[in-house]
Amino acid sequence: VSYTDCTSGQNYCLCGGNFCGDGKHCEMDGSENKCVDGEGTPKRQTSGPSDFEEFSLDDIEQ
């Protein structure tokens, strides 16, 4: 199941031939598109400090 990147914060989003609104998002399961309550699948957040291990300058100068 995949979702469009329209979120429930938008008033309207196109879901196949249907318009989703009122806090719904478009869910696509391959055979049909339907408007469902809630948010779509979250996008990956931008890289943050937790994505990298800390190292000291001494580790670089080898």
From Swiss-Prot:
Disulfide linkage: C6-C13, C15-C26, C20-C35
Region of interest (Interaction with fibrinogen-binding exosite of thrombin), residue spans: 51-62
Question: How is this protein annotated for GO cellular component?
Answer: extracellular region
Glycosylation is annotated at: T46
Has the keyword Transcription regulation been applied to this entry? Answer: no
Q: Where is this site: Not glycosylated?
A: T41
Q: Which family does it belong to?
A: Belongs to the protease inhibitor I14 (hirudin) family.
Which InterPro entries does its entry note? Hirudin, Hirudin/antistatin, Prot_inh_hirudin
Q: Which Gene3D superfamilies match?
A: Thrombin Inhibitor (Hirudin), subunit I (2.70.10.10)
- So which domain of life are we looking at? Eukaryota
Primary role: Inhibits thrombin, thereby abolishing its ability to cleave fibrinogen.
Localization in the cell:
Secreted
Q: What species was this sequence derived from?
A: Hirudinaria manillensis (Asian medical leech)
Biased composition range(s): Acidic residues: 51-62
Q: Does the keyword Metal-binding apply?
A: no
| PTM comment, free text | O-linked glycan consists of Fuc-Gal-GalNAc trisaccharide.
Q: State the signal peptide span.
A: none
Identify the stretch(es) annotated as Interaction with thrombin active site: 1-3
- For this UniProt record, give its keywords in alphabetical order, as a comma-separated list: Disulfide bond, Glycoprotein, Protease inhibitor, Secreted, Serine protease inhibitor
| Name this protein carries in UniProt | Hirullin-P18
